[in-house]
Amino acid sequence: KKRHSVRSYISRKIPEDIRQELSAAIDACNKEGGLHIQLVTDDADAFNTFLAHYGKFHNVQNYIALVGPKAADLDERIGYYGEKIALQAQMLGLNTCWVALTFGKGAARKKCDIRSGEKLVCVLALGYGETQGEFHKIKRISEVCKNETEMPQWYKKGLECALLAPTAMNQQKFEFTRNGSAVSARSTGGFYSKVDLGIVKYHFEIGAGTENFQWK
């Protein structure tokens, strides 16, 4: 039960059948979330920049460009559906890492179809990792959920899952509150915190089970 992000990859191409499965998952998320997320393979340009080296990325040749029409809730939807895709990639044997700032945005834009009114929010580095990644420290439940003494099991499981979620800036700046089966999650600020909130909410749903609660 650890949070891992993989920044170094081996030079192994993603097979066509895996690419097709991933593309199908992306298409489904685009349809459901009103997004324009795109898979970019065999392209090293976006991670061949000073920022990428500063971010300790090595040999990234594939990524998922997280694009959508500009809207107040775009970042949160990008986080939610981007993480859904990242977990699908993991099930297909791939490794990923959320990348908010340390990649070449200009180079990535050239490879993507970004329409008028759309925005490239961030990317997911993708491929076969040299290792299974680096461990990130996680907060305790009491740090993200105050004033809870006797919490139901589904809520505890949801919080445990949320704390294991990777976040775009590795900050875990969020907190949860509950009133019966109505749950609220909010960002406590910082760069890309709305993206992080979407990621965290998706993980909470996996742990808690959507049949047990509703967002408020």
Regions found by a protein language model. Name each.
Residues 1-216:
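Acidic, surface-exposed loops and disordered segments
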